[in-house]
C-alpha cells in the first residue's frame, strides 16, 4: 500500500518546535528573528504566497515585515529597499518574491541581498557554499524535500534519483543535496530524450516542471518514491500537481500529495533558515 508523505503534518511539527526555540532565543538573548518580504506588483499567486509566509512567521513568533511595491517601481528604488533591510539589525532574513516585472533584472536584485540574510538561498555566494559541500543558506523547496525524505526514512545512499526540471530554485540545488547523500543523480529537462524511459529507472523521482498531471504511472517503476513539486490549476481552478496522483499512487511506494506535500515544507524551511540567521547574529 502506498504511503502518503504528509508535508503539512511535518511542517506543523517543525513550526511548533521552532516557536519554542524562538521563545528561548528571545528570553536568553533578547533577539526576535525578523523576516522582511518584498512583493513587487499584484500578481495573485505571489500575493497568496506572501500572505502564507507572513502568517507563518507571526505564528512562530517572528517579527514580520511585508513591503508591497508598485509593479512600476524602478530597479534602483527596489535595491534601495533591500539595502535598507541589509543594514537593519532587527531583520535576519530578506526575501524578494519572484517573479519580478520584466523591466527588473532579478539577478541584480538577488545580488543586492546580503548573503547572510538571503534566506531563499539564491545569492551566488550561497550557491557556491552549496556546491562546495558547505551549505549555509539553501533554497527552501529542495531543503524541505530533504527533510521529508529524512522524516520518512528514505535512505538515499546508492539510490538512483531522477529530477525533472533544472531550475536554479529546485532542480540544480536538489541535485547537489542528493549527491551529498550519495545518491546517483540524473537531472532531466525539456530537451531530455526518452524521458519516460529515464524516469522508469528512478528509485526516487522528483518532479518540478509546472505541467498539471504530466507524469502518469507509465513513468514510474513499482516501488518508487515520488515527490511532486508542481502547483498548477486545472480548468475548475483546483490546485493540482505535476503528477497524476491517483494513478501514480497505484505503483509508487511513497508519494507527496498536492496540496499538503512539498508546499508547506518550503515555508517551514524559510522560517528555519531565518531563525538560524538570527542565531548566527548572536555569535558576532
UniProtKB/Swiss-Prot annotation:
It catalyses: (6R)-5,10-methylene-5,6,7,8-tetrahydrofolate + NADP(+) = (6R)-5,10-methenyltetrahydrofolate + NADPH; (6R)-5,10-methenyltetrahydrofolate + H2O = (6R)-10-formyltetrahydrofolate + H(+). Homodimer. Keywords: Amino-acid biosynthesis, Histidine biosynthesis, Hydrolase, Methionine biosynthesis, Multifunctional enzyme, NADP, One-carbon metabolism, Oxidoreductase, Purine biosynthesis. This is Bifunctional protein FolD. InterPro entries: Aminoacid_DH-like_N_sf, NAD(P)-bd_dom_sf, THF_DH/CycHdrlase, THF_DH/CycHdrlase_cat_dom, THF_DH/CycHdrlase_CS, THF_DH/CycHdrlase_NAD-bd_dom. Coiled coil: none annotated. Belongs to the tetrahydrofolate dehydrogenase/cyclohydrolase family. GO terms for biological process: L-histidine biosynthetic process; methionine biosynthetic process; purine nucleotide biosynthetic process; tetrahydrofolate interconversion. CDD domains: NAD_bind_m-THF_DH_Cyclohyd. Its EC number is 1.5.1.5, 3.5.4.9. Pathway: One-carbon metabolism; tetrahydrofolate interconversion. Catalyzes the oxidation of 5,10-methylenetetrahydrofolate to 5,10-methenyltetrahydrofolate and then the hydrolysis of 5,10-methenyltetrahydrofolate to 10-formyltetrahydrofolate. One of its GO terms (cellular component) is cytosol. It comes from the Bacteria. It comes from Streptococcus pyogenes serotype M1. GO terms for molecular function: methenyltetrahydrofolate cyclohydrolase activity; methylenetetrahydrofolate dehydrogenase (NADP+) activity. NADP(+) binds at residues 165-167, 190.
Amino acid at each position: 500500500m502506498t504511503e502518503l508523505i504528509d508535508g503539512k503534518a511535518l511542517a506543523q511539527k517543525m513550526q511548533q518546535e521552532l516557536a519554542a526555540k524562538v521563545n528561548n532565543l528571545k528570553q536568553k538573548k533578547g533577539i526576535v528573528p525578523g523576516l522582511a518580504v518584498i512583493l513587487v506588483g499584484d500578481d495573485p499567486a505571489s500575493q497568496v504566497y506572501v500572505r502564507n509566509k507572513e502568517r507563518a512567521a507571526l505564528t512562530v513568533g517572528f517579527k514580520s515585515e511585508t513591503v508591497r511595491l508598485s509593479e512600476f517601481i524602478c530597479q534602483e528604488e527596489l535595491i534601495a529597499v533591500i539595502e535598507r533591510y541589509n543594514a537593519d539589525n532587527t531583520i535576519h532574513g530578506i526575501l524578494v518574491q519572484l517573479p519580478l516585472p520584466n523591466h527588473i533584472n532579478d539577478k541584480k536584485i538577488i545580488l543586492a541581498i546580503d548573503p547572510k540574510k538571503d534566506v531563499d538561498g539564491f545569492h551566488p555566494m550561497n550557491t557556491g557554499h552549496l556546491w562546495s559541500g558547505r551549505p549555509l543558506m539553501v533554497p527552501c523547496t529542495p531543503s524541505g524535500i530533504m527533510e521529508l525524505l529524512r522524516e520518512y526514512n528514505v535512505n538515499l545512499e546508492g539510490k538512483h534519483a531522477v529530477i525533472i526540471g533544472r531550475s536554479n530554485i529546485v532542480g540544480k540545488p536538489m541535485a547537489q543535496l542528493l549527491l551529498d547523500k550519495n545518491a546517483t543523480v540524473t537531472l532531466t529537462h525539456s530537451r531530455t530524450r526518452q524521458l519516460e524511459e529515464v524516469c522508469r529507472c528512478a528509485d526516487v523521482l522528483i518532479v518540478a516542471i509546472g505541467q498539471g498531471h504530466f507524469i502518469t504511472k507509465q513513468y514510474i517503476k513499482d516501488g518508487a518514491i515520488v515527490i511532486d513539486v508542481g502547483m498548477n490549476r486545472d480548468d475548475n481552478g483546483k490546485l493540482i500537481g505535476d503528477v497524476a496522483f491517483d494513478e501514480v499512487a497505484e505503483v509508487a511506494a511513497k508519494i507527496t500529495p498536492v496540496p499538503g506535500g512539498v508546499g508547506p515544507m518550503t515555508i517551514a524551511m524559510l522560517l528555519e533558515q531565518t531563525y538560524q540567521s538570527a542565531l548566527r547574529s548572536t555569535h558576532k
